[in-house]
Amino acid sequence: MLGIESSCDETGVGIVRGTTLLTNTVSSSMDEHVRFGGVIPEIASRAHLDAFVPTLQESLQEAGVTLEDIDAIAVTSGPGLAGALMVGVCAAKALAVATGKPLYAINHLVAHVGVGLLDGNRVSEGKHDAVAAAGLGAGKLPENLGALLVSGGHTEILRIRSITDDVELLGSTIDDAAGEAYDKVARILGLGYPGGPAIDKLAHQGNPKSIRFPRGLTQPKYMGTAEEKGPHRYDWSFSGLKTAVARCVEQFEARGEEVPVADIAAAFQEAVVDVISSKAVLACKEHGITDVLLGGGVAANSRLRELTGQRCASAGITLHVPPLGLCTDNGAMVAALGAQLIMAGISPSGVSFAPDSSMPVTTVSVPA
């Protein structure tokens, strides 16, 4: 199975055989977006056009296969940037028509879960934080599985009953995604782009307790109770937090004081990680979820991995974290989900579908 990913600024091509990863080749256009402080859709789309053929050729060479050896093709058809998605979808359709291979249009977010099925892709985060080094892989998911996806475009908690046709959205951000908030706060603090790694690194030098930033949607009117759930019990909001950081910086500057950038970075990060991990664990406990997969680019954040692992362990939940190279956007995760669709007997999507930038997570693959 060959997988193609182009939903944002990474051009990814991955090849799997069943649940065995053969190759995962990624070309990122991140450097082209740095001076703008964020991803520019037009630049990302043009970068995909330039990178696709070399990335495909490199992937086939590393896997030691040809297009004739490929049984089927899977491509991310949403959600994501419309122009970026279009490049990958058009490339996949061209390959499918030229080779006569079946084509599967799959959901980018569910693919982040599918990557957990690849053999030998687990890592352990220390000794006591319940990050599993086993339990996924070999094409079998735990019976009561959830997924916490945290990236620049998405922050969601999912319940996975079947990776191929039964995915439920339990909670999501109602405004900015966590990764987007990191980028915007990094810009406020003058740390550059991408903001996630910069804030994570600087936060180690600061005191997270020096400033108390708000945790969005945690008031009783939003949370409710286990018996009578509030309207946003498992949802997140980061726009107010971003505004609070901006006002904090303005207050220091208005008083003519030096802005404690490291302390603000640490306090901001603690606010984000605190509310993400607490709500995710709450959703898991109240839905009988015993295993949760952490994915998305922000899964690289050291404090998110640490605190989520600690809280999962305290709740008796096993946290699974793929290697960082498979947490971010890549073609291997698309191929992994595509392979599962074939093994489940799901029909291909054909070539008449269109990319869907707002594709709901409940749509695992596009029917013909």
UniProtKB/Swiss-Prot annotation:
EC numbers on record: 2.3.1.234
Cofactor: Fe(2+)
Localization terms from the record: Cytoplasm
Pfam family, one: TsaD
Keywords: Acyltransferase, Cytoplasm, Iron, Metal-binding, Transferase, tRNA processing
Catalyzed reactions: L-threonylcarbamoyladenylate + adenosine(37) in tRNA = N(6)-L-threonylcarbamoyladenosine(37) in tRNA + AMP + H(+)
Entry similarity comment: Belongs to the KAE1 / TsaD family.
Binding annotation for substrate: L149, V150, S151, G152, G153, D183, G196, D200, N301
InterPro entries: ATPase_NBD, Gcp-like_dom, KAE1/TsaD, TsaD
GO BP, sorted A to Z: tRNA threonylcarbamoyladenosine modification
Stored NCBIfam families: gcp_kae1, T6A_TsaD_YgjD
Cofactor notes: Binds 1 Fe(2+) ion per subunit.
SUPFAM superfamilies: Actin-like ATPase domain
GO cellular component terms, semicolon-separated: cytoplasm
Protein name (Swiss-Prot/TrEMBL): tRNA N6-adenosine threonylcarbamoyltransferase
Residues annotated as binding Fe cation: H108, H112, D329
UniProt GO molecular function: iron ion binding; N(6)-L-threonylcarbamoyladenine synthase activity
Chief subcellular location: cytoplasm
Tree of life domain: Bacteria
Function: Required for the formation of a threonylcarbamoyl group on adenosine at position 37 (t(6)A37) in tRNAs that read codons beginning with adenine. Is involved in the transfer of the threonylcarbamoyl moiety of threonylcarbamoyl-AMP (TC-AMP) to the N6 group of A37, together with TsaE and TsaB. TsaD likely plays a direct catalytic role in this reaction.
